Amino acid sequence: MSAAAAALAVPAAASAQGATYNWKMATGWSGGPLMEIGSKAFAERMDQLSGGRFKIQVFPGGALGNALKVPETVKNGIAELGHTWMGYDWGKDPTTVLFGGYAGSFDTERMLHWMYEAGGVEMQRKFREETEGIISFPLGARTAEAFLHSRKPVKTLADLKGLKLRTAGAWLEMAKDLGAAPVTTAGGDVYPMLERGAIDATEWGTLYENIPMGFHKIAKYIIYPGVHQPTAPFELVINKEAWGKLSDADKKLVETVARLVTIDFWLKVGHEDAKALEFFKKAGNTI
């Protein structure tokens, strides 16, 4: 139903005759929900709602460039599109947390209200164009993340002392202040690092998103929900030159599909998180 509703919002000219495009999308994901109901969902719906005029090939993290620097890959023209999380640019510009979520922020529902009804999308677009020279829209928004999947119990702030933790964004700096030893790495590297003991614990996504990551096999202690990330909107980045070649109708199509996927992503993840809680319990994890 949601796809049909979105189709009604797309100008008729966008899905009728017009230019054709064969674009590449760089991502920060090795797989899982971020890839399937985020990146690939966007590509599939662009194809459907354009009448087949937009063909977007989606690449896993690292295939076209550094998985943590997707905006750079897109800006340099290696890919026309990218799907990333703006918080990865925290070290470059702390302003990014306003659009990627941060510790103690409001929840996803209120973040969506701000983005789509109170000017957040327009502010994000202006910020990224002025600072990075790229076009930016929200693409996907998750519910509260799991705070930790840990190889050892973490029950008090004292237990964070010296904890080798994989994280990113503003929480990395906060975790340092709490005595942890945080590092940032792409999602595809997290499980191997946990397995060989290079890190003690990780945060990544919501409970549902973390199932395919396999953390439950080796990190048996979970803290949920994560106050470090009550919401996490993701980002569609577009090469400015490629964007400039689109008609106004096709630009509207891109915006509409990005909004559709964002809402659908939030609904899907929120629904699946409840079932995921039971999955981790049955897997012998302590929550």
Give names to the regions the model predicted.
Residues 117-118:
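Polar helix-capping/helix-linker motif
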Residues 2-6, 15-113, 122-287:
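N-terminal secretory/targeting leader peptides
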